[in-house]
């Protein structure tokens, strides 16, 4: 009887210990599940941060490309304006040369006109001399008539030269007016281009400032990208470590569940044995 009582006491103690171990295992299992859930939350947070980091990286690259494109367009516009200014400068030089040649032709024509006028005056004087002469021999008259004829011919030639000079002068004046009109248009174009160049210069300064700022932002972006890359690597390492930790915890959970199941089976066996013992005692 004492042996049975001792056995019952031992079985009760073993049952109590099994219950305690089962409670401890359940508590440990709950803590493990909570730790697993926390690690999974941290892992999800790291994944979100990783996605945000990649988005920030893409935005930085996009802004940098936009700044570079604007700078290239500004450089192209400046080159086009410079080429246009050079072309107009060449045209102005050609117009100035044309004006100088026209002035030379005008000076030559004026000289010829003056010579023709002098010849006409001389012929007129000879004609008056002939009219005033009332006497003289026929030879003198013939000579004077010849001189008169020659004077008329010289006057006619002078008139022709004068008309040709006047015609050339008129053409020269038309050419000069056209050249002056082209020159005025060119000067207006130059003024307009100078104004545009001033605007472009201001834009260049603005772009240079923006470029400097963009360079600073680019340096900042590069620093940010390096920081984000390091953070990304750190996040990936932490995510990898978290995955390993989750895997280890999952194994621990599985082990604890197996151990809990074993303890429950032991508890059931002890309970069955106690029930059998009580039934045996009741039979006495």
Curated annotation (Swiss-Prot):
Residues 110-130 have a biased composition (Basic and acidic residues). Keywords: Allergen, Coiled coil, Muscle protein, Repeat. SUPFAM superfamilies: Tropomyosin. Residues 1-273 form a coiled coil. Residues 110-134 are annotated as: Disordered. The keyword Nuclease does not apply. GO terms for biological process: regulation of muscle contraction. One of its GO terms (molecular function) is protein homodimerization activity. It comes from the Eukaryota. The keyword Cytoplasm does not apply. Belongs to the tropomyosin family. Homodimer. The molecule is in a coiled coil structure that is formed by 2 polypeptide chains. The sequence exhibits a prominent seven-residues periodicity. Tropomyosin, in association with the troponin complex, plays a central role in the calcium dependent regulation of muscle contraction. PANTHER family: TROPOMYOSIN. This is Tropomyosin.
